């Protein structure tokens, strides 16, 4: 069973915690892996918002009563605070009582993961009361009415961004994420992949703000492809939909082996494309730059080569990445895209032994004259997919970046040609005798 991030709902009795719990769960949606306790215990549900999941935990009312049951309830709440990822503190916007202040004081040490939820905002007129709660010191807050379902969608969207987890099913040979701006051709490509020409294994459709996950077979290999909703340029950083669109794309990148960065050939490259490229490289994922809608281009001689040169200038960090042109409508370049995916996956899984690496390293060192104060000790590959090496030197301060690039270029020649190569520098402390 997957271990989901946990969201704890706390508050005194009668502030609407259970009503909020049920609204967030949204029983009209599919809820799985339920675990119920008795009334004095915590009530837990795995909540699914679109295709993202997290564990939602309802608690008994936090009270100053001294009876045995109340003390047990309070103790359970307090013991849970350390273990969860997010705390929803529910207050009644109409009144704040002594018990509320006691809870607030207990939560001070966890303030970084506390989100204030002001409930019973049943009418727009009550929204003006929110300013009375600003001095409580919690930066994030939501105005909701669990009874009338006001503000719930915004809260659910926030939760799936903040703590939502999504996992790709096992059993795929290659996992590919399709990333790009709206209208870059992602949906057309995914529809082609899931069409009659391909044997579909399974589909998982999402909404326009979610993603579509498709599993199919190609040349005897099982592909799993995730198509995200388009990444928009953020006009307003605080706008949750824009925050979510980028956050969702980053989560997809984390899940997959290879990213197809889809770019409409008629559009300009943007800073958002560059940010995604940096993140992919940082994570060591395979990446293919794909220019879509090639059938709409009046291609002159040398146009594609000029385009590739422009991309390498705009994306110097991706000078290793293959660049393709496709048209789903005209069936241009699709087979080549699949073949490239196989090649990249093989490179991501390549492992070179430490003895072989160091034999080559000795040859490389002879051809490059390092500053006498820097001496290379040895190199070892510590992981595949992502491919990562550790290079040990006598000191790493002011280590020449030119040698780092020289090393990476040589590693590309031994089989890691078109993937990100992560190299960590470590200082080798002289053995004491």
From Swiss-Prot:
**What is the protein's known function?**
GTPase that plays an essential role in the late steps of ribosome biogenesis.
Sorted alphabetically, the keyword list is:
GTP-binding, Nucleotide-binding, Repeat, Ribosome biogenesis
GO molecular function terms noted in the UniProt entry: GTP binding
- Give the EngA-type G domain ranges: 5-167, 174-349
For this protein, the record's Gene3D superfamilies field holds:
3.30.300.20, P-loop containing nucleotide triphosphate hydrolases
Q: What Pfam families does the record tag this protein with?
A: KH_dom-like, MMR_HSR1
Residue intervals of the KH-like domain: 349-429
The family annotation for this protein states: Belongs to the TRAFAC class TrmE-Era-EngA-EngB-Septin-like GTPase superfamily. EngA (Der) GTPase family.
> What is the name of the protein in this document?
GTPase Der
Share an example GO biological-process annotation for this protein. Answer: ribosome biogenesis
Which residues participate in GTP 1 binding? Answer: 11-18, 58-62, 119-122
Report whether Oxidoreductase shows up as a keyword of the record: no
Specify which residues bind GTP 2 according to the UniProt entry for this protein. 180-187, 227-231, 292-295
- The gene name on file is der
Q: How does it assemble?
A: Associates with the 50S ribosomal subunit.
């Amino acid at each position: 069973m997957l271990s989901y991030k946990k969201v704890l709902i706390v508050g005194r009795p009668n502030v609407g915690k259970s009503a909020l719990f049920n609204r967030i769960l949204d029983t009209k949606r599919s809820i799985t892996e339920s675990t119920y306790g008795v009334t004095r215990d915590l009530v837990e549900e795995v909540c699914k918002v679109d295709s993202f999941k997290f564990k939602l935990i309802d608690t008994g009312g936090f009270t100053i009563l001294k009876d045995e049951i109340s003390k047990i309830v309070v103790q359970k709440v307090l013991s849970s605070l350390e273990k969860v990822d997010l705390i929803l503190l529910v207050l009644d916007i109409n009144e704040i009582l002594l018990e509320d202040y006691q809870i607030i004081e207990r939560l001070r040490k966890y303030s970084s993961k506390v989100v204030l939820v002001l409930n019973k905002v049943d009418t727009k007129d009550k929204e003006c009361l929110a300013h009375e709660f600003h001095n409580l010191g919690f930066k994030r807050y939501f105005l909701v009415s669990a009874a009338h379902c006001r503000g719930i969608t915004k809260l659910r969207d926030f939760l799936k961004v903040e703590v939502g987890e999504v996992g790709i099913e096992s059993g795929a040979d290659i996992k590919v994420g399709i990333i790009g701006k709206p209208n870059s051709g992602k949906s057309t490509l995914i529809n082609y992949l899931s069409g009659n020409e391909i044997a579909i294994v399974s589909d998982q459709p999402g909404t326009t703000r979610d993603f579509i996950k498709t599993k199919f077979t190609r040349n005897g290999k099982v592909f799993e492809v995730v198509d995200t909703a388009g990444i928009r340029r953020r006009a307003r950083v605080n706008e949750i939909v824009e925050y979510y669109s980028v956050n969702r794309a980053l989560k997809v990148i984390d899940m997959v082996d290879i990213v197809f960065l889809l770019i409409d050939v008629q559009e300009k490259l943007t800073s958002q494309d560059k940010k995604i490229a940096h993140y992919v490289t940082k994570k060591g994922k395979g990446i293919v730059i794909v220019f879509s809608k090639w059938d709409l281009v009046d291609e002159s001689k040398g146009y594609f080569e000029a385009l590739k040169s422009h991309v390498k200038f705009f994306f110097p960090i991706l000078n290793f990445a293959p660049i393709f042109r496709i048209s789903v409508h005209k069936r241009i370049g699709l087979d080549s895209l699949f073949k490239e995916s196989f090649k990249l996956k093989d490179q991501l899984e390549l492992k070179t032994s430490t003895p072989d690496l160091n034999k080559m390293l000795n040859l490389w060192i002879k051809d490059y004259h390092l500053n006498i104060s820097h001496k290379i000790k040895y190199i070892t590959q510590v992981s595949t997919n992502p491919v990562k090496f550790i290079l040990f030197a006598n000191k790493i301060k002011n280590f020449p970046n030119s040698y780092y690039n020289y090393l990476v270029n040589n590693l590309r020649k031994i089989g890691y040609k078109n993937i990100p190569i992560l190299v960590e520098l470590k200082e080798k402390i002289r053995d004491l005798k």
